[in-house]
UniProtKB/Swiss-Prot annotation:
Gene that produces this protein: htpG
Record's subunit section: Homodimer.
One GO CC term, this protein: cytoplasm
Protein name listed in UniProt: Chaperone protein HtpG
Record-annotated disulphide pairs: none
Keyword field contains Chaperone: yes
Region (A): 1-351
Organism, as annotated: Aeromonas hydrophila subsp. hydrophila (strain ATCC 7966 / DSM 30187 / BCRC 13018 / CCUG 14551 / JCM 1027 / KCTC 2358 / NCIMB 9240 / NCTC 8049)
Length: 641
């Protein structure tokens, strides 16, 4: 390898500088993971070359035996991880090794606490890949040449993990990438042949590319004992495969240990943490495929970025085709990682071909169903573990009913909510739990959406339900309103918002209660008309209500109107929102409303009516358009009291 004069120095992206500093100074309890990450990258490079060579065999350059090699140089204290995969061009080296091209980076650094143990877990969760080399090395040299380019188009990248790196043109005879680690003084264990072999066996048995190390030969020797005087012929040195190099998903699930599944997940997902659960499934018949699907233990930083790449590793007849094949997993299951190996897709498949392919549609349905079945079993068998899943991925799963109509009922069974029957804001109540506790005569499932748990729990709309002992589901996440606009029924029972339309408790109310309501409406007809005239265009309608027991007033939307939370959701998304007028409901039994009816001075009456309307707006919407006028009005009325 010879170096040319075309050398440049580049500064690292700010986030990379921070990451490298963490790599150098974090006390990793498990330093050996750097080798897993680098071998995993080398394996991916081999997979990508194998796929590209399907349409251009010349990329193999008469060397189709793909492999990864570990080379130890004890004298110079270097460990080299070498592959003959796809390789990189100069521009690719600068892009991939000088920047972190993933969303969530800023949030990742914001979450770092300075606690080395906790930060090490976060680093693993973020997935640092190549940069893990700096855990054990104080200098890293990368020499690469892209397949299909001339030997003199090689490139060398080098950095000591500080603020910059150098890039130079070099001549490299073979394609692929060599990552040369100049080990720190205290990392001699990674120069030991047997130590490296044990790490490879532990982490890389499952990858399909052979990992090789050089086995020294033995010289000729003279025998002793019965063979005294005879010459024993030595053995030549040779490259020896040290991993099984068998794709894990092709093996019999009964023969695979949990530890092997866990290590394969870390390879596929580039995660340092064990998965929460997994499912290995082989199907034969009209379609033939194998899926190995994992649910991570922790949500990635970019989970809520729906445009971020997600999906499965796609193989066709054990040949790697692509990463992040999102066509096989709906967006609401974008947290799922794993492998799909199909015998029914063509080897020359592209993302465009996958888009409208019948096989793709069928596989997507099967994979979605498989994940939902795994989650249902987890919820049934291990409530504590499912609660952990829900805390990480629950809000994403709530997108499901809008996206996957066919599985809406199965998704609904997996949802969890807080409720007025529980203590605190823990979301532990399923819809099946709710239905099982419904009061005699109750025909509907009641819920409320609000800005926060406190706003939902203390809403005046819940007063009549508390009085009658009827459970109400409490929702305050931004996605909840979107969810409930698509989940309108469960187990044959309608889901009803307590803040929309006229209150109808059905058989929960007796005839005497209904009669009393009608009488209250008649008795307060004059007051209602005065309030309407006073508020004018500020409200859609005014009426008396029996939904309140402690509050004097509340506002509601009509049965088909847009809810407060949906309006906020659309505004946050920059969507145009039509003007919304609310219905003001008055509690005829409240002292303030009775006092209101006795006020003859129209100006004073108007002040009190406006105050009751603003109070109701504040309780429902969490804010007012003109809070200063509200405060002034309260002060004026207090002075008159």
């Amino acid at each position: 390898m010879t170096q040319s004069v075309h050398a440049e120095t580049h500064g690292f992206q700010t986030e990379v500088k921070q990451l490298l500093s963490l790599m150098a100074h974090s006390l990793y309890s498990n330093k050996e993971v750097f080798l897993r990450e680098l071998i995993s990258n080398a394996s991916d490079a081999a997979d990508k070359l194998r796929f590209k060579a399907l349409s251009d065999a010349s990329l193999f350059e008469n060397d189709g035996q793909l492999r990864v090699r570990l080379v130890v140089d004890k004298e110079n204290r270097t460990l080299t991880i070498s592959d003959n995969g796809i390789g990189m061009t100069r521009d690719q080296v600068i892009e991939h090794l000088g920047t972190i091209a993933k969303s969530g980076t800023a949030e990742f650094f914001k979450n770092l606490s300075g606690d080395q143990g906790r930060d090490s877990q976060l680093i693993g969760q973020f997935g640092v890949g190549f940069y893990s080399a700096f855990i054990v090395a104080d200098k890293v040299t990368v020499v690469s040449r892209a397949a299909g380019t001339a030997p003199e188009q090689g490139v060398q990248w080098e950095s000591e993990g500080e603020g910059s790196f150098t890039v130079a043109d070099v001549t490299k005879a073979g394609r692929g990438t060599d990552v040369i680690l100049h080990l720190r003084a205290e990392e001699d264990e990674f120069l030991d042949d047997w130590r490296l072999r044990s790490v490879v066996s532990k982490y890389s048995d499952h990858i399909s590319v052979p990992v090789e190390m050089y086995k020294e030969g033995t010289p000729d020797s003279v025998g002793e004992g019965e063979e005294d005087g005879e010459t024993i012929v030595g053995t030549p040195g040779e490259w020896e495969q040290v991993n099984r190099a068998t794709a894990l998903w092709t093996r019999n699930p009964k023969e695979i240990k949990d530890e092997e599944y866990q290590e394969f997940y870390k390879h596929v997902a580039h995660d340092f943490e064990d998965p929460l659960l997994w499912g290995h499934n082989r199907v034969e018949g009209a379609q033939e495929y194998t899926s190995l699907l994992y649910v991570p233990a922790r949500a990635p930083f970019d989970l809520y970025n729906r445009d971020q790449k997600h999906g499965l590793k796609l193989y066709v007849q054990r040949v790697f085709i692509m990463d992040d094949a999102e066509q096989f997993m709906p967006a609401y299951l974008r947290f799922v990682k794993g492998v799909l190996d199909s015998n029914d897709l063509p080897l020359n498949v592209s993302r465009e071909i996958l888009q409208d392919n019948k096989v793709t549609v069928s596989l997507r349905k099967a994979c979605s169903k498989r994940v939902l079945t795994m989650l249902a079993k987890l919820a049934k068998d291990d409530a504590e573990k499912y609660a952990k899943f829900w805390s990480e991925f629950g809000n994403v799963l709530k997108e499901g009913p809008a996206e996957d109509y066919a599985n809406r009922e199965e998704i609904a069974k997996l949802l969890r909510f807080a409720s007025t029957a529980g203590e605190g804001e823990a979301q532990t109540v399923s819809l099946e739990d709710y239905v099982g506790r419904m009061k005699e005569g109750q025909q509907k499932i009641y819920y409320i959406t609000a800005d926060s748990y406190a706003a939902a729990k203390n809403s005046p709309h819940l007063e009549i339900f508390r009085k009658k002992g009827v459970e109400v589901l409490l929702m305050w996440e931004r996605v909840d309103e979107w969810l409930m606009s698509h989940l309108t029924e469960f187990d044959g029972k309608q889901l009803v918002s307590v803040t929309r339309g006229e209150l109808d408790l059905g058989d929960l109310e007796d005839e005497a209660s209904k009669q009393a309501q009608e009488e209250a409406e008649k008795a307060n007809a004059g007051l209602v008309e005065r309030v309407k005239q006073s508020l004018g265009e500020a409200v859609k309608e005014v009426r008396v209500t029996h939904r309140l027991t402690d509050s004097p007033s509340c506002i509601v939307t009509d049965a088909h109107g847009m809810s407060t939370q949906m309006i906020k959701l659309m505004r946050a998304a920059g969507q145009p929102v039509p003007e919304q007028k609310y219905i003001l409901e008055l509690n005829p039994d409240h002292a303030l409303v009775k006092k209101l009816g006795a006020i003859e001075d129209e100006a004073l009456f108007g002040e009190w009516v406006t105050l009751l309307h603003e109070q109701a707006q504040l309780a429902e919407q969490g804010g007012l358009n003109d809070p200063a006028s509200f405060v002034s009005r309260i002060n004026r009325l207090l002075l008159q009291a």
